[in-house]
A protein has these predicted regions:
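Short Pro-Cys-Gly-centered "Cys-loop" motif that presents a nucleophilic cysteine in a tight turn
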Residues: 1-57, 66-234
């Protein structure tokens, strides 16, 4: 059965994730993280993209992107993923050794309200949740750290958010959030399902041909059961 064509109109904000194939580690040393950040920067120069957030983890990464034009998200991700794959394989003497990524990137649109703030917090909190650091700003390979360093070379990649950043944002990121918020994000990650209030989600599902993402899968009904399966995504 052919896979569905991805629809990603401009003006919406998207959470984007991709994961290394099998047990590969994408980022083994600082140079690997820096190389990916360079590709991200070059992608923004080729295809204008508002980058709201990112976090690079040892075997996967998260981006929060806000494209202006229809088709930009797909073009941006295609160039970035292909370029990173080519450079990674060259740097690790792995040319011709199979796929670097599990497949095409996962993504879901986010309503630009408290749901977006929840996703931004989720992304920045990733290394804390995985016990890599005690504070999100300590993780060098994410936008939370970059914002704290005015002279950071990646600071120019960051764009403003659609809404004001809360004054106590860093404290919010580093505090334990609501289980239900994180569970809903896990479901959206697992299913590529729009994230927002019920009316917005249904409207986006129809508009973007994502109605199949709202249907329960077999006996997995409700976010508590789905998140059990999706819990390793982080």
């Amino acid at each position: 059965m052919p896979r569905r064509a991805r629809q990603a109109p401009g003006g919406l904000v998207y959470h984007v994730l991709n994961r290394a194939n099998g047990k590969l580690r994408l980022f083994k040393k600082p140079e690997d993280f820096i190389a990916f950040e360079q590709v991200l920067k070059e992608a923004c120069e080729r295809i204008p993209m508002r980058v709201l957030d990112w976090c690079l983890m040892p075997n996967h990464w998260h981006l929060v992107l806000w494209p202006e034009r229809d088709g930009d998200l797909t073009a941006f991700m295609r160039w970035m993923t292909l370029t990173h794959t080519q450079r990674w394989k060259h740097a690790h003497a792995a040319v011709g050794q199979g796929h670097l990524y599990q497949g095409r990137f996962k993504s879901f649109p986010i309503e630009q309200d408290s749901h977006l703030l929840a996703v931004l917090r989720y992304v920045e909190r990733n290394p804390v949740r995985s016990k890599l650091v005690s504070g999100a700003e300590q993780w060098r390979w994410g936008s939370c750290h970059v914002r704290q360093e005015k002279a950071h070379p990646m600071r120019g990649v960051l764009s403003g958010w659609p809404m004001p950043r809360p004054a106590n944002w860093l404290r919010t990121v580093n505090s334990v959030g609501r289980e239900e918020d994180e569970a809903r994000i896990q479901v959206a990650l697992e299913r590529n399902q729009p994230l927002g209030d019920e009316a917005w989600v249904r409207r986006m599902a129809v508009k973007l041909d994502l109605e199949h993402t709202l249907r329960s899968r077999g006996r997995q009904v409700g976010w508590r059961k789905v998140v059990t399966k999706a819990g390793k995504i982080r």
